[in-house]
Amino acid sequence: MLDEEERITMSHELGRLEDLPQDYRDELKQLNLVPLWPSLRAVLPPNVPTRQTQPTYWSYQTLKPLLLKAGELTPIEKAERRVLVLANPGHGLEKMQASAAIYLGMQLLLPGEWAPSHRHTPNAVRMIVEGEGAYTTVDGEKCPMSRGDLILTPTGLWHEHGHDGNEPVVWLDVLDLPLVYYMEASYHIDGERQQVDPGRGDCAWTRAGVVPTPVFQRSDKRYPLLRYPWADTRAALLSLAADQPEQECVQVTYVNPETGDDAENILGFYALMLKPGQTLRLPVRSPAVVFHQIEGRSEARIAESTFALREADTCCAPGYTEVTLKNLSADQPSFIFMADESPLHRKLGVFENRG
């Protein structure tokens, strides 16, 4: 006689594919049919989703020589975009994704090079890692590139990269490519070199709460601000820390200055300042998160993994995972850029914050 616990356990043991007769399985396969119950627990597991994203770390000092070597081996004409992809082994390196919805790549542009104009369906941002003299022209607006700047190249907008300086420039590409590719909606269109228009969004939208209104007209641009200078973001973090010293988490979000919405509609982007010696435990949330060290040194504890982040290092954490960040300096702040899947999760109604 089975007791209650054994009956409950057995009731949750679903039938296996190999339990079915081979001729029945063959007939299903011939008709493009699949029985659900052998795979039901894999696609609908209890309490926490099945995650292929693994805690993963990329050292910039390790990958930089390989990126520069790519510059020697492959001219820009043969690469179009010279990138080393930061691939999460949990998804398989051939998938070229950091998480379910995030693609990361370190891109190199050498002096005098020009990456031709194109547009594509995935959204992208560029977090500038090092170097001066390069620029991205987006929808006719020329955006200079300096370390820590965030530059948007949203879906459907023409963009190209040029370099008038004398040293290599490197930036971190962050795209929602895995999601758009999975939806079978990913493609690009080549274009002609853009004509640069006068004016820049990062000059017109410079103060919170104040927006341009020529003859009482608000901007109708979907993305009025394309470049978020690091100097402004850093100053905002320092000001916030000084104004609210009791606040544990000093963090800002990159937003559309006209609407207050996230800067792009699939991925969210943030800048975080850790005070000297500070340890910060982040809430356990549903979206995966990427961390990129802009300034300083930090330690990231992601589940059972611990990574020491130096400037330009990057790591990622799967969703539903405990993350603790620590500033390894006792006298200097640490600045971290973050990207996550929050906007997507909120739009789909699956966002969770478990505290």
UniProtKB/Swiss-Prot annotation:
SUPFAM superfamilies, per the entry: RmlC-like cupins (SSF51182)
UniProt pathway: Aromatic compound metabolism; naphthalene degradation
EC number, UniProt record: 1.13.11.4
UniProt cross-references to Gene3D superfamilies, sorted A to Z: Jelly Rolls
Pfam family, one: Cupin_2
Keyword Aminoacyl-tRNA synthetase: no
Enzyme class: oxidoreductase
Domain Cupin type-2 per the UniProt entry, residue ranges: 106-174
Keyword Transport assigned: no
InterPro entries attached to this UniProt entry: Cupin_2 (IPR013096), GDO-like (IPR047183), RmlC-like_jellyroll (IPR014710), RmlC_Cupin_sf (IPR011051)
Biological process, per Gene Ontology: naphthalene catabolic process
Keywords, ordered alphabetically: Aromatic hydrocarbons catabolism, Dioxygenase, Oxidoreductase, Plasmid
Catalytic activity annotation: 2,5-dihydroxybenzoate + O2 = 3-maleylpyruvate + H(+)
Its job: Catalyzes the oxygen-dependent ring fission of gentisate between the carboxyl and proximal hydroxyl groups at positions 1 and 2 of the aromatic ring to form maleylpyruvate. Can also catalyze oxidation of alkyl- and halogenated gentisates. Exhibits higher affinity for 3-substituted gentisates than for gentisate but has higher activity with gentisate.
Family: Belongs to the gentisate 1,2-dioxygenase family.
Protein name in UniProt: Gentisate 1,2-dioxygenase
Organism annotation: Ralstonia sp
